[in-house]
Amino acid sequence: MSDDSSSPLTTLKILIIGESGVGKSSLMLRFVDDVFDPEQAATIGVDFRVTSMTIDGNRVKLAIWDTAGQERFRTLTPSYYRGAQGVICVYDVTSRSSFEKLKHWMTEVDTYCTNDNVIKMMVANKIDMPNRTVTREEGLKFAKRHRTLFIEASAKTKEGVQCTFEELIEKIIQTPDLWDNDRPTFRLGQPTDTSSGNLCGC
């Protein structure tokens, strides 16, 4: 995904949260390994992947935490939110209940994230499915209300997956307070419009 011969600008902690079954693991595995398993088992506790990517000429290392959506794992909550610079909150466009519970997940982010300016991305997953129950307009409205980035995606078809991480990481890099200021020199292209409800142009 990037040239490992160059040292990374920084290491970023990225969380993927949301209800069980919305496709969190599938999104992570599609991004990291470019694979999709329709029989992907539910995450037990926390899964973890490390990868790297290059944004505007800056290589960054990503520590991606894929969290379980089940209530019985809520005791893990404070530890895995600690120090996160980015949070991807996923819902399933075919599951109305997963969308309605987004408010709960946003409350968790506000309660447990130690970085006040953590970058949040709302991902409407499974847009390849025909039985959609949550409209794009509803997702955009929620994202605007909670001041998060927004994108629609499909881990199955790959649509929007790369853009999800690229847009999130670019916004983090544009927020220097979120990462190590011991290395202040970095190169950025023209800043993109990352206002609430922005859709990646990939």
From Swiss-Prot:
<feature type="binding site">
    <location>
        <position position="126"/>
    </location>
    <ligand>
        <name>GTP</name>
    </ligand>
</feature>
<feature type="lipid moiety-binding region" description="S-geranylgeranyl cysteine">
    <location>
        <position position="200"/>
    </location>
</feature>
<feature type="binding site">
    <location>
        <position position="37"/>
    </location>
    <ligand>
        <name>GTP</name>
    </ligand>
</feature>
<dbReference type="InterPro" id="IPR050227">
    <property type="entry name" value="Rab"/>
</dbReference>
<keyword id="KW-0653">Protein transport</keyword>
<dbReference type="InterPro" id="IPR025662">
    <property type="entry name" value="Sigma_54_int_dom_ATP-bd_1"/>
</dbReference>
<feature type="binding site">
    <location>
        <position position="43"/>
    </location>
    <ligand>
        <name>GTP</name>
    </ligand>
</feature>
<feature type="binding site">
    <location>
        <position position="69"/>
    </location>
    <ligand>
        <name>GTP</name>
    </ligand>
</feature>
<keyword id="KW-0449">Lipoprotein</keyword>
<feature type="binding site">
    <location>
        <position position="155"/>
    </location>
    <ligand>
        <name>GTP</name>
    </ligand>
</feature>
<dbReference type="GO" id="GO:0012505">
    <property type="term" value="C:endomembrane system"/>
</dbReference>
<dbReference type="GO" id="GO:0006886">
    <property type="term" value="P:intracellular protein transport"/>
</dbReference>
<feature type="binding site">
    <location>
        <position position="23"/>
    </location>
    <ligand>
        <name>GTP</name>
    </ligand>
</feature>
<dbReference type="InterPro" id="IPR005225">
    <property type="entry name" value="Small_GTP-bd"/>
</dbReference>
<feature type="lipid moiety-binding region" description="S-geranylgeranyl cysteine">
    <location>
        <position position="202"/>
    </location>
</feature>
<feature type="binding site">
    <location>
        <position position="25"/>
    </location>
    <ligand>
        <name>GTP</name>
    </ligand>
</feature>
<feature type="modified residue" description="Cysteine methyl ester">
    <location>
        <position position="202"/>
    </location>
</feature>
<dbReference type="GO" id="GO:0005794">
    <property type="term" value="C:Golgi apparatus"/>
</dbReference>
<feature type="region of interest" description="Disordered">
    <location>
        <begin position="183"/>
        <end position="202"/>
    </location>
</feature>
<feature type="short sequence motif" description="Effector region">
    <location>
        <begin position="40"/>
        <end position="48"/>
    </location>
</feature>
<dbReference type="GO" id="GO:0005525">
    <property type="term" value="F:GTP binding"/>
</dbReference>
<keyword id="KW-0378">Hydrolase</keyword>
<keyword id="KW-0636">Prenylation</keyword>
<dbReference type="Pfam" id="PF00071">
    <property type="entry name" value="Ras"/>
</dbReference>
<dbReference type="InterPro" id="IPR027417">
    <property type="entry name" value="P-loop_NTPase"/>
</dbReference>
<dbReference type="InterPro" id="IPR001806">
    <property type="entry name" value="Small_GTPase"/>
</dbReference>
<feature type="binding site">
    <location>
        <position position="128"/>
    </location>
    <ligand>
        <name>GTP</name>
    </ligand>
</feature>
<feature type="binding site">
    <location>
        <position position="20"/>
    </location>
    <ligand>
        <name>GTP</name>
    </ligand>
</feature>
<keyword id="KW-0488">Methylation</keyword>
<protein>
    <recommendedName>
        <fullName>Ras-related protein Rab-18</fullName>
        <ecNumber>3.6.5.2</ecNumber>
    </recommendedName>
</protein>
<comment type="similarity">
    <text>Belongs to the small GTPase superfamily. Rab family.</text>
</comment>
<dbReference type="GO" id="GO:0003924">
    <property type="term" value="F:GTPase activity"/>
</dbReference>
<dbReference type="GO" id="GO:0034389">
    <property type="term" value="P:lipid droplet organization"/>
</dbReference>
<feature type="compositionally biased region" description="Polar residues">
    <location>
        <begin position="191"/>
        <end position="202"/>
    </location>
</feature>
<feature type="binding site">
    <location>
        <position position="24"/>
    </location>
    <ligand>
        <name>GTP</name>
    </ligand>
</feature>
<keyword id="KW-0342">GTP-binding</keyword>
<feature type="binding site">
    <location>
        <position position="26"/>
    </location>
    <ligand>
        <name>GTP</name>
    </ligand>
</feature>
<keyword id="KW-0547">Nucleotide-binding</keyword>
<feature type="binding site">
    <location>
        <position position="38"/>
    </location>
    <ligand>
        <name>GTP</name>
    </ligand>
</feature>
<keyword id="KW-0813">Transport</keyword>
<comment type="function">
    <text>The small GTPases Rab are key regulators of intracellular membrane trafficking, from the formation of transport vesicles to their fusion with membranes. Rabs cycle between an inactive GDP-bound form and an active GTP-bound form that is able to recruit to membranes different sets of downstream effectors directly responsible for vesicle formation, movement, tethering and fusion. Plays a role in apical endocytosis/recycling. May be implicated in transport between the plasma membrane and early endosomes.</text>
</comment>
